[in-house]
Amino acid sequence: MRKLLLSNDDGVHAPGLRALHDALDRHGRLRVVAPDRDKSGASNSLTLTRPLSLTALDNGFYSVDGTPADCVYLGVNGVWDEKPDLVISGINHGGNLGDDVLYSGTVAAAMEGRNLGMAAIAISLCGERYFDTAGRVAATLVGAAESLSLPPRSLLNVNVPDVPWEEIQGVRVTRMGYRGPAAEPMRVRDPRGRERYWIAAAGDNADDGEDTDFAAIEAGFVSITPLQTDLTRHAALDDVRNWLDALSNS
């Protein structure tokens, strides 16, 4: 039976993680390793300045006092004698669209699985209501990953519209869109009168063309975006070389 490692960034007690577990319960041997609290926005950070605690909970899940990437690292290297066959992260409470993936702990947990040699899927619900819909999508994809042999080190970012299953329009393979700059931080004062700051909402869609994840969700489709860890802007390599040549000759 396949070994499936589940994690998230909303925390080990999040409804989305429970929904993912319940949806995949018949698809393999499950192990859940997730942060002990909400770690949204943690991205790919690892805890390097202190030791981590891995705690077994009464429901069979494991909690870690660290980041989503920590959880997958420990889940792969510290919980099982054998490596998992697939890492699934989610179900996130809210979408991870466009350049959200640069900040997302949900995507980072899946990416850590990919970095450790496994195929991985990050799944997010673009809302907080129909987790059962996202769970059915996850179960379908995990079944397909088994029958069609999703290659090792594959990384899929999946976003699901927050609608009943019957209202899903289909599935689109998409590219990442991108957002404009985020809003300015919100300034507040604490009880002692000191100024504090809340990080503001993400920016508006700057690229939501028909082939993007934004457009797929807006039209009611599940969005599946294959991701890679190579952030090199290959089209700019020659431009930068020419710029340096001009600089050295000036």
Curated annotation (Swiss-Prot):
SUPFAM superfamilies: SurE-like (SSF64167). Its cofactor is a divalent metal cation. Its main location: cytoplasm. Binds 1 divalent metal cation per subunit. A divalent metal cation binds at D9, D10, S40, N92. It is found in: Cytoplasm. Pfam families: SurE. The keyword Cytoplasm applies. Its EC number is 3.1.3.5. Keywords: Cytoplasm, Hydrolase, Metal-binding, Nucleotide-binding. GO terms for molecular function: 3'-nucleotidase activity; 5'-nucleotidase activity; exopolyphosphatase activity; metal ion binding; nucleotide binding. InterPro entries: SurE, SurE-like_Pase/nucleotidase, SurE-like_sf. GO terms for cellular component: cytoplasm. It catalyses: a ribonucleoside 5'-phosphate + H2O = a ribonucleoside + phosphate. Belongs to the SurE nucleotidase family. Nucleotidase that shows phosphatase activity on nucleoside 5'-monophosphates. This is 5'-nucleotidase SurE. It comes from Chromohalobacter salexigens (strain ATCC BAA-138 / DSM 3043 / CIP 106854 / NCIMB 13768 / 1H11). The lineage of its organism: Bacteria, Pseudomonadati, Pseudomonadota, Gammaproteobacteria, Oceanospirillales.
